[in-house]
Regions:
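Residues on the lipid-exposed face of transmembrane beta-strands in outer-membrane beta-barrel proteins
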Residues: 53, 91-95, 105, 139-143, ...
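Outer membrane beta-barrel transmembrane domains
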Residues: 64-73, 220-320
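Residues that define the transmembrane beta-barrel architecture of outer-membrane proteins
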Residues: 47, 85-89, 131-137, 153, ...
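Extracellular loop and loop/strand-boundary signature of outer-membrane beta-barrel proteins
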Residues: 38, 75-79, 122-129, 178-183, ...
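Repeated loop/turn-to-beta-strand initiation elements of outer-membrane beta-barrel proteins
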Residues: 49, 101-103, 148-150, 203-208, ...
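Outer-membrane pore/translocation modules
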Residues: 111-226
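Transmembrane beta-barrel strands of outer-membrane/channel proteins
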Residues: 51-57, 105-109, 157-163, 195, ...
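Outer-membrane beta-barrel biogenesis signature
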Residues: 20-73, 149-150, 154-156
């Protein structure tokens, strides 16, 4: 069987933009999106917590090769991918230790349904996986640089680890173990390093930010190493009223090929750029609701992979 899913999004944690985040290969369909206040020009006080609950819907149902969409008839491999539906719930808790230091823990729950046809030119077999599992946890630190000459500018470094807390041996009802790229966890420990910069915009009470993040597996299990990732997010926040803000982001992701005996390097890795318009509503000073739509504006996939035409994100953030 060949798993060929596009990286519609990649995982993230709050300090990063997602999952992870982020913060996520085929098993990492998370949105590359920044919903963290600290990189959008909204400061957090020392000793405060930030809890973020974020839902993502990512429906991968179109085959692409390179930059072109293809039909199932054009797919001559030994497996024809049909569809992967991802419903992710990402919970992130941040703690601001001081004016310079903060820590973050992010845990995803992955609800994934995938189907394909094995050996489509022979004894075709329909196979499907449905599971809801905890994914890989990210533990991150953030250091904010002092800037006494220009205190409205916010800049810093992010660093930490993605830990192998997610299962990587999930099987379907027939006992067939899903391939590693489909699993809720990669089985790897990854090092994460990034930086951010935010400053006031050209309009009153607006702001802009740029954020970069690099992730690489440093410890792996059972002959599978996920490809290195680099993501770059640029965004502008503009107030539409006292409580409502518009946010427009450009999110890019470069994902290297997976490697190892249980990987498929020819069918993994991609380069993607997304346009992400959204709205943020402040219920109170410390409680926000947000929603975004993520639209691909450039995609290139190694081999044949499932891709997504749009993704949806909605969530709530509270500081206390």
């Amino acid at each position: 069987m060949n798993k060929r899913f596009a990286i519609a999004c990649s995982g993230g944690a709050a300090l990063l933009a997602a999952a992870g985040a982020a913060q996520g290969s085929c098993g990492s369909a998370f949105c590359v999106l920044n919903t963290n206040w600290s990189t959008q020009g909204v400061a957090s006080d020392p000793g405060s917590f930030r809890l973020d609950e974020r839902f993502e819907f990512v429906d991968q149902k179109h085959l692409m090769q390179g930059t072109k969409r293809i039909s199932q008839a054009d797919d001559t491999a030994d497996t024809t991918e049909l569809r992967t539906i991802n419903r992710n719930l990402l919970t992130t808790l941040d703690y601001t230790v001081s004016k310079n230091w903060a820590v973050s823990v992010s845990v995803p729950v992955v609800d994934r349904s995938h189907s394909h046809i094995a050996n489509p030119t022979g004894a075709a077999t329909f196979e499907k996986w449905d599971f809801t599992k905890v994914g890989d946890t990210r533990v991150l630190g953030m250091y904010r640089f002092d800037n006494e000459k220009n205190p409205v500018v916010n800049q810093g470094l992010m660093f930490g680890l993605k830990l192998p807390t997610g299962d990587y041996r999930v099987s379907n009802a027939d006992g067939s173990v899903a391939e590693r790229a489909l699993q809720p966890g990669t089985g790897s420990t990854d090092f994460v390093l990034g930086g951010y910069y935010s400053a006031p915009g050209i309009h009153l009470d607006s702001s802009w930010f740029v954020q970069g993040l690099y992730q690489q597996a440093v410890s792996t299990k059972e002959e599978y190493k996920p490809g290195n990732q680099f993501q770059l997010n640029v965004g502008y926040r503009y107030p539409l009223g006292h409580d409502l803000q518009a946010l427009l982001q450009i999110n890019s992701l470069i994902k290297g090929r997976d490697s190892g005996a249980n990987a498929e390097p020819d069918l993994s890795g991609s380069k993607s750029v997304f346009l992400s318009p959204g709205l943020i509503y402040s219920v109170t000073h410390d409680f926000q609701l947000y929603s975004f739509v993520q639209l691909p504006i450039y995609r290139f996939y190694n081999g044949i992979q499932l891709s997504v035409d749009w993704a949806f994100v909605a969530g709530a953030t509270v500081r206390f």
